[in-house]
Amino acid sequence: IDYACKRQAFGKPLIDHEGVGFMLAQNQIDLKQAELMIDWCASVLDTGALGTTESSMAKVAVSEALFRIADNCVQVMGGTGLSRDTVVEQVFREVRAFRVYDGPTEVHKWSLAKKIKKSHKIANEG
């Protein structure tokens, strides 16, 4: 945010360019959604429930959101965002792995799809 507010391009701060402002707005939205998903999943687990569906949903949503956020930060900073002189490059590298830890995103989505199909079958048997 500091970079986007201070860096000038075409006579105005980067953040005042619609494309950059929209990316930063999306980052804020993604962060809040990730926070809410984590809180929701934790509340389910706090009841003593297994929370397998909820944790899969949260894992996918949060890891995908973090990757989008990091990618947007690199994009806003341009070549500077890929420099090892900034924390953005390190965060980008590290959050990419979140989409693989504890099962890749696709495995969690596949598991959720199987549960959706099973629920549909049960609902339509009666």
Give the location of each predicted region.
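Alpha-helical interface subdomain recognition
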Residues: 1-126
